[in-house]
Structure formats: structure tokens, C-alpha cells
């Protein structure tokens, strides 16, 4: 019986393990503490259930596991509600009739924030996925606007066609790079442009009403209205767009926590009246959700604030890095708590990072995190500390430069690398000017007739240059003389004309007197 009881307990444990993934993962992610700990032993846990940018962190390549964790910052899901709202976005189901700018302005008024932006304009009659970024998340708007989009639309054909297969073939033909001109009523200049259609297919066709439902995956800035007109031209019957809905923008689609304007209004009302922020946290998502498709680079806590101030992303500050990083690829730099620090352009591949121990890993493209979220950890070395003490005592000026009180030993020992780099930069143009210019090559006809003369020394200019200079001087002198002569002639002409006028006046007076 004892053996039977033992086997039943084991079975229960197995059932419990199996039931873990079926639990509400979102609640666990909000309640538990998630952090990459500074230890050499990797914990045996299921990191596929970790939230946002920390998902599967144990599968990243490890450069080092040792760093000093700082209490600053917080997991994106555990931020205070004010910070959570200011660094979030809403996957909004845009209603028909209001424009995208009106919708964004309404959300700004509802949430009482200063700044909002959206992921790409939708026409007033178009519904569907509109990503509304709030305050700090507006730094990601540019990258979201250029991301690919997916649409489901209804096209109305002006005349009947032979079969549904004909329409399906025509829709699939309109793929690849296509010429497009914006519609007659458009907010932009009607210039011819090229846009790429990645994939398109017919979903359904009603031959009685001549309506076809189609799905399109396309580049940002594609006009589906123009695509429907082209479809009608291709079939030879004419066509126009009847309805349109955006089902995906970037990496977020209809099924990814899409909310309505009423949900946003209710969530804010619930927080204002009942101090319940759970609805706001459900409606607004952290900005890190938009970056889950990027390759990751995990930085030490001590390097975070330096990057926020624009420092280079150097290899000694890197803890972990992802497989498959390529040159000039856009990556996301994150903290050990899973917060996005910045977007960057990779200057090293994964292979180079694994073999090097120094150098610049990536170039900052856009800083996302606010400055001084983490403490400053630069200027804490012995020389920097000594310099701060000397500034306090008045031995150096407020900029750290020598003054009358500065001891001679400091002037001799201390090397200001900023000034030395400026001097080197100033020397470069002088060195370029001092480089000897190569003598001009003669034409082939001249070189054949004349003997080759040795090149003149750089101290004395060649006779050709002297003769050119003399010619220029002579020309200038001639022009000056001509100008002077012309001036004298003009004066003489003016004087002659004035004398003639006086004579005429005298004659007129004499005539008048004689007549009287």
C-alpha cells in the first residue's frame, strides 16, 4: 500500500508541473521579481515564461556574469503607475469617422499626458490597429511608422467578371515593387512613388454584388485605395475600395491586447475614482513590448546612465549578447531588469564580440531611457576624485583647469586628454597643407616633342607658375588703367554737355529779349 501511495504522490507532482504553463502567466509576471542575478551558476528555470525583453535570457551568450546590481530602475511591469503610463503605448482599435490625429488628441486629454504619437496615419473611414505611443514611448514612433502593415479590405468591381479565380490571379499578380500615386483626395503631394507589396490573397468573392474581400501584407506608406483601382484596371472592369481595416502594424496585430476608446476612458475613470490601476495596466502596455523582435545586448547597471548621456557602448560594459547580430543591424540595449536603454546600430558581429575584450560594440541611434534613472558611475577613479577635491579647495577653476593657485606638480603630472585630442585635430589640416603637391603631368604631344626636365625643388616655384602670376598682374594693371581712362572720358563728356546746355539757354534768353 505504501508503494501505491508513493506512486500516487509522484503522479500528482507530475500533474502539478504540467498544469503550471496553463496558469495565468500574466498574473505571475506582474507579481514575481524578475532580474538577471550576478552569479556564475545559471538557475534551472523556465525563462520562456519571463516577460518582454528578459524572455529566454539564459539562451543569450555570456560575456561575464559578475556585476554590482543597483537598486535603481524597475522591471517594466512593476513601474509606478505614473512612470508606467508615461513609458507605455496603447494598441488601439481606431473607430470609423474621426481622423488619427483627433483620436490621438482625445487619448492625450483622457490620460492627461503632455505628448502622444501614432504609428502611421489611418484615413477617417478606415478602422483597426493604431499604435498610440505615450510620452517617453514617442521616441519609438519613427521606427513604428516605417514598419510593415497588414490590411483586410473590400473591393467593389464595376462590372461582372468570368470567375472568382480570375480575381484571385489578379490580386496575386499585384505583388512586389509597384508604382503608386496617392489618391485624388490625399494629405500629401501627388508624386509617383514605389511601394512593395509582400503578399496578397483573395479571401472571399460575392459575384451577385461584385464584392471581393482580400488580405494584403505591404510596406509602410502603401495606398490600398490605389491598389483597388489598379486591380480594376488589370481586370478591365474598373474597381474601387469599399471598406478597409488594418489588422497588423509592425509586430502587433488585432489579437495582441487591442482595446477601444471606451476601454481607455473606463480604465482612467476607475483609477481616478477607485484608485484601482489594474485596468490601466491592462490597457497600456510597456514600450519594451514593441522591441521584442530586436536582437538584445544586456549591459551592466554601472554603464546604464553613461549610455543615457551619450557614451559609446563599449565591450567591458556588456554582460550578455544574442546570437546572429550582424553589422549595421538595429539592436536594443537593455538593463538586467529588462528595461530598454536605447536603440543602437551594431558595429560588431556576434563572432567578433565573443573573441574581443575591448572596443565599441554599437553606435547609439535613439536613447529611450530618461537620464539619471540610474546613478552616475563615471569620474569615481583616484585621479578624478583628487581633481574634485582640488576644485572644492580652489586649486583648480570650476571647469577643472589650472589657475594661479594650482601647484606645479599637478601641471607637470596631469595629462588633459581632451586638450591633447583638440591639438591633434588642429595639427591634421596643417599637415595636409604641408604635403608637397605633385607636378602636373604634361600632355602626350608635349612630352613627345620636348625632353623630360627634372622636377623643380619645392622651395622655388616652377617658371610656368611665375609666368602665370605675372600675366595676372599685368591684366589687373591694364583693367585699372582702362577704368581710370574711361572715368576721365566720362567727366570730359559731362563737362562738354553742360557747356552746350548753357549756350542753348543763353540763346533762348537773347531770342526772348529781342522778341519783347
UniProtKB/Swiss-Prot annotation:
Enzyme kind, highest EC tier: isomerase
Described purpose of this protein according to its UniProt entry: Catalytic subunit of H/ACA small nucleolar ribonucleoprotein (H/ACA snoRNP) complex, which catalyzes pseudouridylation of rRNA. This involves the isomerization of uridine such that the ribose is subsequently attached to C5, instead of the normal N1. Each rRNA can contain up to 100 pseudouridine ('psi') residues, which may serve to stabilize the conformation of rRNAs. Required for ribosome biogenesis and telomere maintenance.
Matching PANTHER family: CENTROMERE/MICROTUBULE BINDING PROTEIN CBF5, H_ACA RIBONUCLEOPROTEIN COMPLEX SUBUNIT DKC1
Chain residue ranges for the region called Disordered: 1-24, 422-516
Description of how the protein assembles with itself and partners: Part of the H/ACA small nucleolar ribonucleoprotein (H/ACA snoRNP) complex, which contains NHP2/NOLA2, GAR1/NOLA1, NOP10/NOLA3, and DKC1/NOLA4, which is presumed to be the catalytic subunit. The complex contains a stable core formed by binding of one or two NOP10-DKC1 heterodimers to NHP2; GAR1 subsequently binds to this core via DKC1. The complex binds a box H/ACA small nucleolar RNA (snoRNA), which may target the specific site of modification within the RNA substrate.
Primary subcellular site in the record, as a coarse category: nucleus
One of the Pfam families matching this protein, by short name: TruB_N
Keyword ATP-binding: no
Database matches in SMART domains: DKCLD (SM01136), PUA (SM00359)
Family: Belongs to the pseudouridine synthase TruB family.
Residues forming coiled coils: 463-516
NCBIfam families (alphabetical): CBF5 (TIGR00425), PRK04270.1 (NF003280), unchar_dom_2 (TIGR00451)
Keywords: Coiled coil, Isomerase, Nucleus, Ribonucleoprotein, Ribosome biogenesis, RNA-binding, rRNA processing
EC number of the protein: 5.4.99.-
Composition bias, Basic and acidic residues: 434-446
Gene Ontology molecular functions: pseudouridine synthase activity; RNA binding
Gene Ontology CC terms: box H/ACA snoRNP complex; Cajal body; nucleoplasm; telomerase holoenzyme complex
Endoplasmic reticulum in keyword set: no
Name of the protein described by the UniProt record: H/ACA ribonucleoprotein complex subunit DKC1
One BP annotation, GO: telomere maintenance via telomerase
SUPFAM superfamilies: Pseudouridine synthase (SSF55120), PUA domain-like (SSF88697)
Location relative to the cell: Nucleus, Nucleolus; Nucleus, Cajal body
Catalytic activity: uridine in 5S rRNA = pseudouridine in 5S rRNA
Bias-annotated ranges (Pro residues): 453-464
Domain PUA: 294-369
Origin organism lineage: Eukaryota, Metazoa, Chordata, Craniata, Vertebrata
